[in-house]
Swiss-Prot record:
Together with its co-chaperonin GroES, plays an essential role in assisting protein folding. The GroEL-GroES system forms a nano-cage that allows encapsulation of the non-native substrate proteins and provides a physical environment optimized to promote and accelerate protein folding. This is Chaperonin GroEL. InterPro entries: Chaperonin_Cpn60_CS, Cpn60/GroEL, Cpn60/GroEL/TCP-1, GroEL-like_apical_dom_sf, GROEL-like_equatorial_sf, TCP-1-like_intermed_sf. GO terms for molecular function: ATP binding; ATP-dependent protein folding chaperone; isomerase activity; unfolded protein binding. Its EC number is 5.6.1.7. PROSITE patterns: CHAPERONINS_CPN60 (PS00296). ATP binds at residues 30-33, 51, 87-91, 415, 496. HAMAP family: CH60. Its main location: cytoplasm. Residues 537-547 have a biased composition (Gly residues).
Length: 547
């Protein structure tokens, strides 16, 4: 076991804060309409250029273990904000740094860290209520486009394309993003389906940055029962390997030896495979699997019809242009199903909806109908170079997530204005002691930082702008950093999803609270040994299968 380095008290927190500063300084430059790009070296290929806070944060790893512990904690605030709301990562980073730094100063001055935390939590809960009160629901295509435009750093085309995609498949519809083969940026609606089942093992992931498994032009095996042994599947697996195409297995479950064998072969490169549980339960599961079979022109392998896995040929497998699997969802895009068969299935489900008397059954049938007939909107992002396409694709994905958040919880005035004005009622909060009051004041000061940073990235004095806005009673009055003018933010279309603002603050406070209440830090002591040579990859030919 490696020996440990143990640090206590303010020394530990100070070193952690140094790591937090390093990460926050790299991330904060991306905030606002005049935020700058960050260039990140890749282990292979050309460098990545991004204005996405969480991408910058994820790329940072510090050599010093204690500083790195602080940086990783701050990174978790950005990552959580991205996971929950899809945006607000830079805001979360800026807030967390401000809260942690001010909190640490007070702990060093003798304030009780637990009471500081209680005061901070009181203040944050009050701000969250204020955000909910001031949020405005969005309905029109124009409002949806505004959110998409702001979340993509002012790219109007991205906002308009997202609004168009939502109009095509509905606000709750499935929208995916992929790279185009040309310069254009288009919206295409294709046959497709999404269901709420994710990969059965993280070892199936092909894109570790986004933690998703992406299968291009895969075969799809649909099996009604549980898979616990792969022996009956050997002939079909060998045929798939020979075809050099990926395989998606959808079954009631894949467990034990079968799952372990698939994972081993996926890691060794012999078989590009992923496995997910079938959606639904009981008879509904079977019906949904039949829907997928029709959508992908495959067969549901069911023992009721006397079908056995060992007799299945490649002709019984479904196919699709692409399948994307996350931890929670599977999206099948452009299944190879026959259009007439899909239409017949849709009519069959419609007649079942008309006949059923159960509201629950009707709701579930309508869900199936929406999945089968709604299709998938694909945002195809093009550009002149690979670097440009990847950078724009990242912005489209962020903007799409933020737009979904806006549809869910409404929008508030953007540009850091909502957080700034939400700090004003905090002075009236009742507390038990002066330490809790100090916790509230930490939050009041930190809420000014996102707006200050946006203004400073635009080349103006943040403190002066904050002072001017606090004198104004209109909560929507703010500073348009793009045009360098004071405006009504809502009327000017400068809006943020309420969910993004709320999540950024809650995640930042959670991380800052952890830092100020940390008294002891234990990390591995730096090793004097030279780092081992990296293992060389290599997997030739079709061999190496381990069934």
């Amino acid at each position: 076991m490696a020996t440990k380095l143990i640090k206590h008290g303010s020394k530990a927190r100070e070193q952690m804060l140094e790591g937090i500063d390093i990460l926050a300084d790299a991330v904060k430059v991306t905030l606002g309409p005049k935020g700058r790009n960050v260039l990140i070296e890749q282990s292979f290929g050309s460098p990545k250029i991004t204005k996405d806070g969480v991408t910058v944060a994820k790329s940072i790893e510090l050599k010093d273990k204690i500083r790195n512990a602080g940086a990783q904690l701050l990174k978790s605030a950005a990552t959580k904000a991205a996971e929950v709301a899809g945006d607000g990562t830079t805001t979360a980073t800026v807030l967390a740094r401000a809260l942690a730094r001010e909190g640490n100063k007070l702990v060093a001055a003798g304030y009780n860290p637990m009471d500081l935390k209680r005061g901070m939590d009181l203040a944050v809960n009050a701000v969250v209520e204020e955000i909910k009160k001031s949020s405005k629901k969005i309905n029109s295509q124009e409002e949806i486009a505004q959110v998409g435009t702001i979340s993509s750093n002012g790219d109007k085309e991205i906002g308009e394309k997202i609004a168009k995609a939502m109009e095509e498949v509905g606000k709750e519809g499935v929208i995916t993003v992929e790279e185009a083969k040309n310069f254009s940026f288009d919206v295409e609606v294709v046959k497709g389906m999404m269901f709420d089942r994710g990969y059965l093992s993280p070892y199936f992931v092909t894109n570790s940055e986004k933690m998703v498994a992406e299968l291009e032009n895969p075969f799809i095996l649909l099996f009604e029962k549980k898979l616990s042994n792969l022996q009956p599947m050997l002939p079909i697996l060998e045929a798939v390997v020979q075809s050099q195409r990926p395989l998606l297995i959808i079954a009631e479950d894949v467990e034990g030896e079968a799952l372990a064998t698939l994972v081993v072969n996926r890691l060794r490169g012999g078989l590009k495979v992923a496995a997910v549980k079938a959606p639904g339960f009981g008879d509904r599961r079977k019906a949904m699997m039949e829907d997928i079979a029709i959508l992908t022109k495959g067969e549901l392998i069911t023992e009721d019809l006397g079908m056995k896995l060992e007799n299945v040929s490649i002709k019984s497998l479904g196919t699709a242009k692409r399948v994307t699997i996350s931890k929670e969802n599977t999206v099948i895009v452009d299944g190879n199903g026959d259009k007439k068969n899909i239409e017949d299935r849709v009519l069959q489900i419609k007649s079942q909806i008309a006949e059923t008397t159960s509201d629950y059954d009707k709701e579930k049938l309508q869900e199936r109908l929406a999945k089968l007939s709604g299709g998938v909107a694909v945002l195809k992002v093009g550009g002149a170079t690979e670097v440009e396409v990847k950078e724009r694709k990242d912005r489209v994905e962020d903007a799409l997530a933020a737009t979904r958040a806006a549809v869910e919880e409404g929008v508030v005035a953007g540009g850091g204005v909502t957080l700034l004005h939400a700090s004003q009622p905090l002075t009236k909060l009742k507390v038990e002691n002066k330490d809790q009051q100090a916790g509230i004041e930490i939050v009041i000061e930190a809420l000014k930082d996102p707006l200050k940073q946006i203004v400073e990235n635009a080349g103006e004095n943040g403190g002066v702008v904050v002072g001017k806005l606090l004198e104004h009673k209109d909560k929507n009055y703010g500073f348009n950093a793009q045009d360098m003018q004071y405006v009504d933010m809502i009327k000017a279309g400068i809006i943020d999803p309420a969910k993004v603002v709320r999540t950024a603050l809650q995640d930042a406070t959670s991380v800052a609270s952890l830092i100020i209440t940390t008294e002891t830090l234990i990390v591995d002591e730096p090793s004097d040994k030279a780092e081992p040579m990296p293992m060389r990859g290599g997997m030739g030919g079709m061999g190496g299968m381990d069934f």
